[in-house]
Amino acid sequence: MPADPGPEVGSGWPGLLMSCLKGPHVILKMEAMKIVHPEKFPELPAATPCFPPAPRPTPTLAPKRAWPSDTEIIVNQACGGDMPTLEGASHTPPLPRRPRKGSSELGFPRVAPVDEVIVNQYVIRPGPTASAPSSSGPVIAGEPLECPTCGHTYNVTQRRPRVLSCLHSVCEQCLQILYESCPKYKFISCPTCHRETVLFTDYGLAALAVNTSILSRLPPEALTAPSGGQWGGESEGSCYQTFRQYCGAACTCHVRNPLSACSIM
């Protein structure tokens, strides 16, 4: 009995595999390359670039001037090499340094002497006879000893002279009336030059300094407290008594030395 030949060649997966093995062989050619490092052959010359780099131009530096002169030139201040000299040129020495200013010239506040009175950034210096008042003898010309508004002589109690911003003095009684006549604006017009003094603080008339130069020239009777009431018993010619005569529009006090023009109102 003949043997079973088995499954037919070419049928199924085994046949397909066998048919692939029996096909023509494909040979792929590959070239092998060997990389050799140049460190192993130091005798070989280094490869030169095809195009050498173009040389760069060196910039020329302008010489520095040591001082304002066209003949003296310093090429390099950091190196101590030879300096170019110009024949026939005069050497101009550098300008001397200015001395430093002292503390008084730099605007530092100075210490004011004891006999000076500073009023609203002004300085009042006493006269030559301020330290020794004389009871007898002529009075040296200066600011008058009478108030320019009421005409009464200053004293050390109710009629002390107060200095305004214009450096004119007015007695305290007249200043109080001028101050109360315009409570809204708080500035006083000088009866002498008609300039205005603004009181920026709430101290009122106490913000105005007392003119000690006038007090030092007062007679002895003005240095004592007067007898009478608050205003010294002066019933006539007093600015306090003529308070009702102040006109609201012109602000004029009709006394011995009235104000011709006042810009308070």
Curated annotation (Swiss-Prot):
PROSITE patterns: ZF_RING_1, ZF_RING_2
Gene Ontology cellular component list: cytosol; nucleoplasm
Gene Ontology molecular function, alphabetical: ubiquitin-protein transferase activity; zinc ion binding
UniProtKB keywords: Metal-binding, Phosphoprotein, Zinc, Zinc-finger
Cited Gene3D superfamilies: Zinc/RING finger domain, C3HC4 (zinc finger)
PANTHER family hit by this protein: RING FINGER PROTEIN 208, RING-TYPE DOMAIN-CONTAINING PROTEIN
The protein's name in its UniProt record: RING finger protein 208
Organism (species): Mus musculus (Mouse)
